[in-house]
Design a protein with these regions (language model features):
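Short linear motifs embedded in intrinsically disordered, proline/glycine-rich low-complexity segments
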Residues: 1, 9, 13, 49-59, ...
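Mixed-charge (acidic/basic) macromolecular-recognition segments
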Residues: 1-22, 32, 210, 215-259, ...
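Extended assembly-interface regions of large multimeric machines
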Residues: 1-201, 205-214
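C-terminal domain/tail detector
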Residues: 27, 337-582
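Extracellular ectodomain segments of secreted/surface proteins
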Residues: 40-41, 48, 52-59, 77, ...
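Residues at beta-strand starts and edge strands
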Residues: 84-86, 144-148, 164-166, 189, ...
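Short, aromatic- and glycine-rich surface loops/edge beta-strands on solvent-exposed regions
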Residues: 107-110, 262-272, 397-404
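Short, low-complexity Pro/Thr/Gly
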Residues: 155-361
Length: 582
């Protein structure tokens, strides 16, 4: 039972009504009247209160048997906790990297021990390592414009033309009021980028060579099924780790390959509008070789020895400290027969393969999610079925499982710089450390009204977003952190108050000589309800990606945002699917 309220209510009722009952049955006064408790009777009352509390909780749980099956089939990620997240920085070993070296996403890193357990994180972005460092950042402001000069120098004087520098990814790190503002200036007021290697060698890049990061499928923080729309993932990740989007790529750097004998380049960002006086970019605010990281890793499950007395079994990772782990997902299930001496794969019941070749005697598994008794985190249960849903008779076979796990709420106890230890899946030519504190692990409400809210979202179309209340409910539904963190909850409410109105209207555009009809989504906001104007712009950028869900294959969407506080109008290019068409 995850909610102690039910237990306390039942126990209080038994004690209070017990006194009244004892008045009519004097022989039981010694056991039931207040102030004179028999320890054995007290234990019986507590046990009875626990069981009846579970019954009440079951009555109030709003039919999770229906919602969980549907969610497992369509949106399995909402039956999983959001693991701890952070930003990690990699640094190549001196002399070990002399040209572009890619660290693929999924590289592993371990933390300091907490209660004897190391928390494992894996990277979410590919990281291009170069033998370069940021040696200086200068900012120049005038009344009408600003310039930020970033000086990059190679290690030991290596030539820029020889290190394979084609795309450079930078991370905006530090105070929110600075990073969000610079993000806004990069994608709203950037005039051009100039590469200066000295000696009169200069090259100009347009604003289209600076690209945002974090919207693509291969840049996801959380594993998502192919059945799920990536727009919902973006919303969930935005509320979980907004710094994930504080990255940008500078493309078009192949020009440097034609300039020999240069080891230093100045990357100059020229803006058409002056930065606010309180925004001063320093060396610490721009980082190279960074990536988000998530507390997820592969682990074997405890083998399950099947027995006829049980239909459902708890899924446990192999560990002596079960409380340090939480099962994120079941990746593989096999049964092993001692008599046949072979492994037989079991397929998830919701895969619908049970409807194929029904004559074959195949077994399937179902998983169920519930809250831990402690109320922190989720636990999973597994059962085995035939093709028609009946309980399968697997005899005395043993079930083996491969799991994807997190360290539950253990990882949130880590601090900046605690994730520095290598594993066999870590890069050998670089060191790493987390430059942000890992976030709190957050579990969804698996038994209750949230599941029905999520199912209701499936029926949304672009007309639904024209209702400002529906839009706010949609956004708050995916903000899991605001459900467990009071400060995050207040910030979420304040942010939603800054969304004033929404409107959708059909529009026509000409693309390659052909008239195409789409939908323009107009949003009125007030940046005073956000951290600053840049914070509002970041949320609108994520929303721009999200509304692609409501565009059919032969149509497009277009976002326009009006800020009441400043009078600024922001427009995003028309999108069809995942392609910019105008």
């Amino acid at each position: 039972m995850s909610n102690s309220k039910y237990f306390q209510d039942e126990l209080t009722y038994l004690r209070e009504s017990g006194s009244e009952f004892a008045k009519y049955h004097p022989k039981l006064t010694h056991f039931l009247s207040e102030g004179t408790f028999d320890p054995d009777v007290e234990r019986l009352l507590e046990g009875f209160a626990f069981l009846t509390g579970r019954i009440r909780e079951k009555i109030d749980d709003e039919l999770p048997e229906l919602t969980q099956s549907l969610m497992t089939l369509l949106w399995p990620h909402y039956m999983r906790s959001i693991p701890s997240l952070c930003i990690s920085e990699l640094k190549p070993h001196t002399g070990s990297v002399t040209e572009k070296t890619v660290v693929k996403r999924g590289a592993e890193m371990a933390s300091e021990q907490i209660e004897g357990t190391q928390c494992l994180f894996r990277t979410c972005y590919d990281v291009d390592l170069y033998p370069i460092t940021i040696t200086n950042i200068e900012q120049t402001n005038s009344r009408t414009s600003s310039t930020i000069d970033v000086t990059l120098s190679t290690e030991h004087g290596l030539e820029l033309s020889r290190i394979g520098l084609d795309t450079l990814r930078l991370h905006l790190y530090g105070e929110i009021h600075i990073t969000r503002t610079v993000f806004l200036w990069l994608f709203r007021y950037l005039d051009y980028v100039e590469l200066d290697v000295g000696g009169g060698y200069k090259h100009r890049l347009g604003p289209e060579y600076v690209k945002p990061v974090g919207h693509e499928e291969d840049e996801a923080l959380l594993p998502y099924s192919k059945n799920s729309f990536a727009g919902y993932r973006l919303l969930q990740e935005f509320f979980s780790l907004p710094d994930k989007f504080m990255f940008f790529d500078i493309k078009g750097l192949k020009w440097l390959k034609g300039i020999p004998q240069r080891s230093t380049v100045k990357v100059k960002f020229h803006f058409k509008r002056a930065l606010p006086s309180e925004v001063v970019l320093k060396d610490k605010h721009l980082r190279l070789h960074c990536t988000p990281a998530v507390n997820l890793f592969q682990k074997d499950g405890d083998p399950i020895r099947l027995e006829h007395r049980r239909n459902e079994y708890k899924v446990r990772p192999q560990s002596n400290t079960q409380e340090h782990y939480e099962v994120y997902s079941i990746e593989q299930v096999e049964s092993w027969s001692k008599d046949e001496r072979r492994r037989k794969p079991l397929i998830e019941f919701e895969s619908f393969e049970h409807q194929i070749n029904q004559r074959d005697k195949r077994e399937f598994y179902k998983s169920k999610v519930g809250e831990r008794v402690s109320g922190r985190g989720l636990e999973r249960y597994i059962s085995f079925h035939t093709h028609n849903g009946d309980i399968a008779d697997l005899g005395t076979e043993t079930v083996l499982m491969k799991l994807q796990c997190s360290n539950a709420d253990l990882a949130e106890r880590l601090s900046v710089g605690d994730i520095t230890y290598a594993t066999h899946k870590s890069p050998t030519y670089a060191t790493f450390k987390n430059i942000t504190k890992p976030t709190q692990s957050v579990s969804p409400q698996v038994n209750g009204e949230l599941q029905w809210q999520l199912i209701a979202n499936m029926s949304l179309n672009y007309l639904s977003l024209a209702n400002i209340d529906v839009l706010k409910v949609l956004l708050s539904t995916y903000d899991f952190h605001s459900r467990v963190d009071r400060q995050a909850h207040r910030a979420s409410i304040h942010r939603l108050d800054g969304i004033v109105s929404s409107e959708i209207k059909p529009i026509d555009r000409v693309f390659r000589g052909v008239s195409v009809r789409g939908n323009q989504f107009k949003l009125v906001t007030n940046s005073k309800f956000f951290v600053n104007e840049g914070d509002m712009f970041l949320m609108a950028t994520v929303l721009n990606e999200f509304i692609r869900l409501y565009s059919s294959v032969n149509s497009f969407t277009e976002l326009e945002v009006f800020d009441e506080a400043t009078g600024e109008v922001y427009n995003w290019a028309s999108l069809i699917g995942q392609q910019t068409i105008l």
